[in-house]
Amino acid sequence: VTRRFVEAYTRQVYDWCQAHDLAYTGHYNAEDSLWSQIRWIGAAMPHYPYMHIPGIDKLGRQINTAAGTVLTVKQLDSVVCQWGKPRALCENYGCGGQDFAHTGRKWIGDWAYVLGVNLNNPHLSLYSMRGERKRDYPQDIFYQQPWWPENRLIADYFARLSYVLSQGQRVVDVLVIHPIGSAWTLYRPGAARDVEQL
């Protein structure tokens, strides 16, 4: 299933972007647990080699939970290291709420960077917050926020950190076998517990 998805979609988008001097980036849906990967994308890691800047999504105001686990970041980091990719992107702060300001953003961003991310992609900048837009997985990071005039403080911090962390070459001497194959053998629709215990 995963191989077919990669060949029928991810690799074709990657090849098209490559042929047109574009960088394919973004994240796949439901990459945050083994169970959700099987249900939505088969497995996250096989897609990442066919992205110029592979990425993940870190939702909410918490770390190390189902909505943003260490597993998610380390899967990305592993492929970036193995394939020599220069960047590991994380879309941060979605579903954090409109009142999620600098200290929370720094905490979440630093957590992701410690685990291997080196490109911060803040979630959502709306030109207008009319209608349903103000409720679209906030936070909106733009002029509508009362702290917008000071946003440069955190933006510059992550820009500098991203640059520094993208300049070196990491030496990784630890091998961890990823459990997605075992997860597939335990998978049963509607029964997440066995898979999530891995």
Give residue ranges: language-model regions:
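Carbohydrate-binding surfaces of carbohydrate-active enzymes
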Residues: 1-198
